[in-house]
Amino acid sequence: MPERSDLTWLFFKTSGRVSRAAYFLGGLLVAIIQAFPLYRFTLVPEGSAESNMWSFIFFIAFIASLWSNIALAVKRLHDLDKPGITALILFVPIVSIVAFLVLCLFPGQPGPNRYGQRTNEPAQP
């Protein structure tokens, strides 16, 4: 199992590079974490205290997943030797689908680039 600092880097830091597989699997995990409270919300009676609790948990999960998706995309763009600011394109409807496919399908730069020596590790200062 990865160390806690590795998971913190993967989901919350923007330095370094990630591979296509790490980007896709990290994004899938974020989506599952985000979907769970939404699923639980649909199972409880509308307007109940439990409903309010699950909607609040979903809101927190959504905010955390938003940042996690940005951090993953920035590191994936770094692997393609592109600036992280380009990740903002993921907020444009329709274009975001194409951008997601590009990030999942295009191979990263082999060897070192200006964002890190190797894929799937933080950049060294």
What do these predicted regions represent?
Residues 1-29, 69-85, 102-125:
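Membrane-interface extramembranous regions at the lipid-water interface
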Residues 31-66, 71, 84-90, 96, ...:
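Membrane-helix interface segments in multi-pass membrane proteins
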